[in-house]
């Protein structure tokens, strides 16, 4: 009987030790890592560092700009952007605030940010995926922020261009 009890206790303790060794996801460390990546990504544009800027974009990245027709693959966005980087001045986005969220698996992260740009205050949002040991930006969306009280004036300005764009559909 003592052997059965000892065996039972041993199995219980072994199982308890095995389950306590499970690595828990440190969400605050992941958020810090992603935040640093995004800060450095925006800095790479400010520094006109083409290689570093595009290094963190996944091969399947989609970059969505402020104009209706601006939906670019990584390659298309790189081709559009290269002349700006080559001149030594791409763009400068300064983060005002950023919120970072993540999936339960902590392999997918999404964020929103308010940024100060040459267009004034804008909103960026995006999705990152953990691939092997590094994060890759899968999608980034840049939107111009318009106060609700000013939206009618913007709608009036956009009508002509929207009509031209909508003829495609």
Task: Describe each PLM feature range.
Residues 17-55, 149-151, 155-169:
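Short, low-complexity N-terminal intrinsically disordered segments enriched in polar/charged residues
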Residues 62-72, 84-90:
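A short gly/proline-enriched turn/hairpin at secondary-structure junctions
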Residues 63-65, 110-111, 137-139:
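Short hydrophobic/aromatic-rich beta-strand segments that constitute the beta-sheet cores
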Residues 68-71, 115-118, 142-147:
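Solvent-exposed loop/turn segments at secondary-structure junctions
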Residues 78-121:
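Surface-exposed, charged secondary-structure patches
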């Amino acid at each position: 009987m003592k052997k059965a009890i000892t065996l039972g206790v041993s199995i219980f303790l072994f199982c308890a030790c095995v389950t306590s060794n499970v690595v828990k996801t440190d969400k605050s460390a992941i958020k810090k890592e992603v935040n640093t990546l995004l800060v450095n990504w925006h800095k790479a544009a400010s520094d006109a560092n083409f290689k570093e800027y595009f290094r963190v974009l996944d091969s399947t990245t989609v970059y969505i700009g402020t104009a209706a027709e601006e939906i670019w693959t990584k390659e298309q966005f790189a081709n559009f952007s290269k002349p700006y980087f080559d001149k030594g001045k791409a763009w400068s986005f300064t983060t005002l605030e950023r919120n970072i969220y993540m999936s339960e698996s902590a392999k997918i992260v999404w964020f929103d940010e308010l940024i100060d740009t040459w267009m004034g205050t804008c909103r960026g949002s995006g999705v990152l995926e953990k691939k092997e040991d590094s994060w890759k930006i899968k999608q980034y969306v840049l939107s111009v922020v318009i106060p609700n009280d000013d939206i009618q004036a913007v709608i009036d300005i956009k009508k002509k261009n929207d009509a031209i764009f909508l003829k495609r559909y």
